[in-house]
């Protein structure tokens, strides 16, 4: 699972000439659902070649490989950089910008679940239960991040209106390794405005909170 889930990011090692091309190519074809569907049967076949005793589990291998690949792209979609999931039909980078690219609050519950599964391998039911708990906690964190992003977006919109700031585009994303403090960048006719907002502010935001 770890190896398959890492495959889409191996495109960073392709020699494309310069950093701009490298950045544009990353999270493109290698992260597109269509190409993942094409690659899945081949990868499942290779796994069964390596583990011939599991040939009778063909459907499970195909499902496992496809889930490992697709969830990789979906997770990348939660970051600010966007992922071209729908190539070759659309090159629009899909991104919800709700989680920083490195966030231990998401990663640690998953690691806890994996470690628990191995530690309690003599008690498989307990290991599986703890693994599911870790996965559930990390998934709830992603759901929370989407809610926090929506809330901050509404706060930013009100604050912009209160300050009579007109923006053509707004970028809202969490600061490193948390989903509490958010950074806001807005594009105006004369330049940019920037600010921060914390979800721990329970009172109604005043104009000085951002901008």
What are these regions (language model features)?
Residues 202-211:
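Single conserved hydrophobic/aromatic residue that forms the stacking wall/gate
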Residues 1-154, 158-174:
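N-terminal membrane-targeting hydrophobic helices
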Residues 92-93, 179, 210-211:
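A broad, structure-centric signal for solvent-exposed, well-ordered loop/edge residues
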């Amino acid at each position: 699972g770890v190896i398959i889930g890492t495959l889409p990011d191996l495109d960073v090692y392709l020699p494309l000439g310069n950093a701009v091309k490298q950045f544009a190519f990353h999270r493109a074809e290698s992260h597109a659902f269509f190409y993942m569907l094409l690659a899945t049967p081949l990868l499942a076949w290779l796994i069964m070649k390596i583990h011939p005793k599991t040939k009778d589990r063909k459907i499970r291998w195909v499902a496992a490989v496809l889930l490992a690949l697709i969830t990789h792209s979906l997770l990348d979609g939660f970051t600010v950089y966007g992922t071209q999931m729908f190539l070759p039909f659309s090159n629009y980078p899909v991104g919800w910008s709700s989680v920083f690219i490195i966030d231990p609050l998401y990663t640690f519950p998953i690691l806890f679940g994996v470690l628990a599964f191995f530690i309690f391998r003599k008690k498989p039911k307990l290991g599986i239960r703890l693994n599911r708990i870790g996965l559930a906690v990390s998934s709830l964190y992603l759901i929370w991040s989407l809610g926090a992003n929506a809330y901050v977006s509404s706060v930013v919109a009100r604050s912009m209106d209160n300050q009579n700031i007109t923006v053509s585009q707004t970028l809202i994303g969490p600061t490193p390794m948390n989903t509490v403090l958010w950074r806001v960048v807005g594009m105006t006719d004369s330049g940019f405005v920037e600010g921060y907002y914390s979800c721990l502010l329970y009172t109604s935001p005043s104009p000085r909170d951002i901008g």
